[in-house]
Amino acid sequence: MSDAVTDADGSSAQSHAQSAGHHAVQGHGGHSQGPLLKLAVGAIGVVFGDIGTSPLYALRDTFAGHHKLPLDLLHIYGIISLMFWSMMIIVTFKYVSVIMRADNKGEGGSLALLALINQHTDGKRWGRGIILLGVFATALFYGDSMITPAVSVMGAIEGVAVYRPDMHPLIVPLVVGILIGLFFIQSRGTEKVAAFFGPIMLVYFGTIAVLGALSIAEYPPVIAALSPHHAVTMFIADPWRGFLAMGAAVLAVTGAEALYADMGHFGRSPIRMSWLVFVLPALVLNYLGQASLLIRNPAALESPFYYLAPEWFQWPLLFIASCAAVIASQAVISGAFSVTQQAIQLGFIPRMTIKHTSTAAGQIFIPVINWALMIAVILLVLVFQRSSNLTAAYGIAVTGAMLIDNFLLAVVLFKLWQWKAPAAIAMLAVFFAIDAAYLGANMTKIPDGGWVPLVMGIAIFTLLTTWSRGRALMRENMAEGTIPLDVFTKSAHSSAARVSGTAIFMASTAAGVPSALLHNIKHNKVLHERVVILTVSIEDVPYVDEGERYSVKDFGNGFYRLTLRFGFLEETDVPGALKGVSMCGEPFNMMKTSFFLSRQTLIPSDKPGMALWREKLFAWMLRNAASAMEFFRLPTNRVVELGSQLKI
């Protein structure tokens, strides 16, 4: 694990983490304000969009997808049983009951979990393996972020062709138009419309529950499909096709990790309550209703979700489902912004321009991510054309991330919670068996589109690990021959002229003299009255207490070493943090303070460390990283950049 980044940005990343979950658009700490019911409604609007829109295509694709099952009672009952118990074991037990207990100062999500784990595994030989798994899950998350908006919106809009077959040629243009509009409004922020997400999703879940219940009433015996023995019977009678069908059945639990990822925004109790009391029953009723419809009318397989509606309600259902799909897509896009911000802080991704669309924490817009996602999503729609084709690509990213979560959970159980081995192993064995089976079933869909998230994942994993490794090599090379600060201050105090004001030199580590200071002495031959060597440290916690915000060491003669600490969910507002520093001489006056940054130009070489092509890739990423001045919110007219060359 690294403990710093480079002089170029002066920050120190003390942990690396990953994410495979979605993050909400709400601010941190929301669960401490307002009544439980209000927070539960908010959670329904953000957390459950992905899993909530699964009924649009999950059951249909089990019987009409790439690995079709016979449409008979054995397989209908078996799949409904499999979906129900998957939701109970994976979502309700694994995520809601177990993983949601593993919070990092109230924050959830795999990034927060990995940062928490790092505190207990730093320096361990196997710790790096856990980190790499986490990084790969982050890469899979980005693949998921590309597929979810495409499959959700397309799955909803395909209802147009169900009711009006002559409008089928308009589906792809409609989907592309909606998605382009969705990505274009991101820069304006979604705070004003976000207040409607909860009520709209309440209407959606209420609607699918009622439609499902009405269909169940037409064939009440379908309720028996909830018994686990029907899934077992199906696998015994038809093991191979049952296994292949798991590739589509897993669609019923996509988005499960969002419950954990958004815990910091809404709190554990509101999410649990909304899932157990409202969302889960609505999903179960709808899946049972679709099963009842297929038993009574096999021709409804074209779209059992939409054929549940009576004729007079068909277009209203299409509108409600389309709104739900857009909301689900919005939650994923906001999650991609949130994960990227955390990954930047934790040292996995180069600095990017981050724009705040609201005063509320978490309301951010990252242009590079937004436009990259938009291009990828539209390409997926144009290439795959139908949601049933896209679902083949969907499952691998989801099941891969879920399997990796088991490894992270294992560390939590043994290292953090100190569980006894028999209980931990028994529970983990169940989780690993289920997730591995689902992943194996989805691997059979690689030729049908499953290769898409794998290729995306490997490409993004390469970028993330190249950046992380490149920064580590830079730190190692810069540390070679570093002059101790106490030695430097004794000689510099007597040999350089002093000028009025304060100079802050951004440093990557809390040891040695930063290259910007050495270059300033070499070229300008002066020192300011007060010289502060500043390191920004990103901690393994989401938020740092104000009492632990900074530490100062006074070297005398106007020399100070200052460390500012930020959590991985906080903005690195250096001028704002400096206002609270009281042990570094007189208070900081930004108009009398100059910030000195060092900008390295990398020269790829044949030195050991990374392959030459990765060194060139890293150099390109570094050149295109956002300005440290902007990232740390430094006043533009008070910054001096000094260049240097560095071989890696």
Curated annotation (Swiss-Prot):
InterPro entries: K+_transporter, K_trans_C, K_trans_N, Kup. GO terms for cellular component: plasma membrane. The keyword Signal does not apply. The chain crosses the membrane at residues 39-59, 73-93, 130-150, 165-185, 193-213, 243-263, 275-295, 317-337, 364-384, 394-414, 421-441, 446-466. Its main location: membrane. It is found in: Cell inner membrane. It catalyses: K(+)(in) + H(+)(in) = K(+)(out) + H(+)(out). Keywords: Cell inner membrane, Cell membrane, Ion transport, Membrane, Potassium, Potassium transport, Symport, Transmembrane, Transmembrane helix, Transport. It is a multi-pass membrane protein. It holds the Pfam family K_trans. GO terms for molecular function: potassium ion transmembrane transporter activity; symporter activity. Residues 10-26 have a biased composition (Low complexity). It comes from the Bacteria. Residues 1-31 are annotated as: Disordered. PANTHER family: LOW AFFINITY POTASSIUM TRANSPORT SYSTEM PROTEIN KUP, OSMOTIC STRESS POTASSIUM TRANSPORTER. Transport of potassium into the cell. Likely operates as a K(+):H(+) symporter. Belongs to the HAK/KUP transporter (TC 2.A.72) family. HAMAP family: Kup. This is Probable potassium transport system protein Kup 1. The lineage of its organism: Bacteria, Pseudomonadati, Pseudomonadota, Alphaproteobacteria, Sphingomonadales. The gene is kup1.
